[in-house]
Regions:
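N-terminal presequences and immediately downstream first alpha-helices
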Residues: 87, 226-228
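Short loop/turn positions at the edges of beta-strands in beta-sheet-rich folds
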Residues: 88-90, 220-222, 270
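Short acidic-glycine motifs
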Residues: 77, 301-306
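Outer-membrane beta-barrel signature, preferentially recognizing the C-terminal barrel domain
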Residues: 148-152, 202-211, 224-225, 232-297, ...
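Residues on the lipid-exposed face of transmembrane beta-strands in outer-membrane beta-barrel proteins
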Residues: 80-86, 96, 159-165, 214-218, ...
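Signature of Gram-negative outer-membrane beta-barrel scaffolds
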Residues: 65-67, 93-221, 241, 251, ...
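Conserved glycosyltransferase catalytic-site signature
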Residues: 77-78, 157, 271-272
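Outer-membrane beta-barrel domain signature, strongest for Gram-negative TonB-dependent receptors
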Residues: 1-104, 109, 286-288
């Protein structure tokens, strides 16, 4: 992090040739050439400059300009599975299972090295907003959490069953499952830019889904086999694709602090698929011809961008 210094990355966009070539007043070829040479000859982070900046700030009783930190995700998970299998007769087999999973995910940034500095400010240097109003204007150092801190609680319960039928030339199966998934964000920091929507527990987000699968295989002979499968599934979106910016607020996709946006709440993903296979065997080789169709609805993906 570089709250008190310039971006130390040699690949910072304002130091690359493309930045000068995209100048609104026309391409700056001289600047682009100089940037290219600097990148070729000095393409590594200048650690000496970073340490010098922090040591200079120490002498002036200022906070460090640079620190090294890591984004941490510490998960604690409990999983319970139960399975049941029974052979009704030589032609019919039944499988069933029940599953429970509980996840507590602790997410935070932690300073791992002060890079010669003594202290660091837990303030966003871009807009001068506090990262944690619960401890305003705090000073942090190595081993301290800063920038963001929240926990994500997730719980999933599911039931699954499948029945298989097997005869001389014909095999087929039918399977189904139901699943309930819940997410809840618990903010440890109160981000000033999201005050009132950052600390504490947010709303519990719940998803109910089900799935149905079926398939049939017909063996004309040991050399020629036809196989068909179909499925319709509903599944909860991932945690990442449910919350728009979980590091700093409780907002979920399709809503903000004021409620729903365009009356479009986030919902389960719907997946429909079919496939058909023809398998043939000869003494020389084995081949397979496959055709398939898949359709996904109500899926979403969170992306981020930087605006200068």
């Amino acid at each position: 992090d570089y709250a008190g210094g310039a971006n130390p990355s040699p690949a910072y966009y304002q130091d690359l040739p493309s930045y000068f070539l995209a100048d609104t007043d026309g391409p700056d070829y001289e600047g682009a050439y100089i940037a290219q040479e600097n990148f070729i000859n000095n393409g590594q982070i200048n650690w000496n400059r970073i340490y010098d900046a922090n040591l200079t700030n120490n002498q002036a009783n200022l906070n460090a300009a640079y620190v090294l930190y890591e984004d941490r995700v510490d998960d604690t998970q409990l999983t319970i599975n139960s399975a049941y299998n029974r052979e009704i007769n030589e032609n019919i087999k039944v499988t069933a299972s029940a599953n429970y999973r509980n996840l507590v995910s602790d997410n935070f940034a932690e300073i791992s090295d002060m890079l010669g500095g003594y202290s660091y400010s837990n303030i966003d240097s871009f807009d001068y907003l506090d990262y944690n109003l619960l401890s305003p204007n705090s000073i942090v150092s190595e081993g301290d959490k800063f920038k963001y801190h929240y926990k994500m609680n997730a719980e999933e319960m599911s039931l699954f069953s499948m029945i298989n039928f097997s005869f001389n030339k014909l095999e087929f199966y039918v399977a189904g499952d139901i699943t309930n998934t819940t997410y809840q964000r618990d903010g440890i920091f109160e981000n000033e830019a999201n005050a009132g929507n950052s600390a504490g527990k947010g709303d519990e987000i719940s998803f109910d889904g089900y799935g149905v699968k079926a398939g049939i295989t017909y063996k004309f002979s040991g050399k020629h086999i036809l196989d068909f499968n179909s499925a319709y599934l509903q599944k909860a979106p991932s945690i990442r694709n449910t919350f728009t910016n979980s590091r700093v607020n409780h907002n979920v996709v399709g809503s903000d602090i004021n409620g729903l946006i365009n009356d479009s709440p986030i919902t389960e993903e719907k997946i429909m698929s079919f496939d058909a296979n023809y398998i043939f065997r000869t003494p020389i080789f084995t081949g397979r011809l496959t055709g398939f169709y898949s359709e996904v609805k109500d899926a979403n993906e969170i992306s981020f961008y930087y605006a200068d």
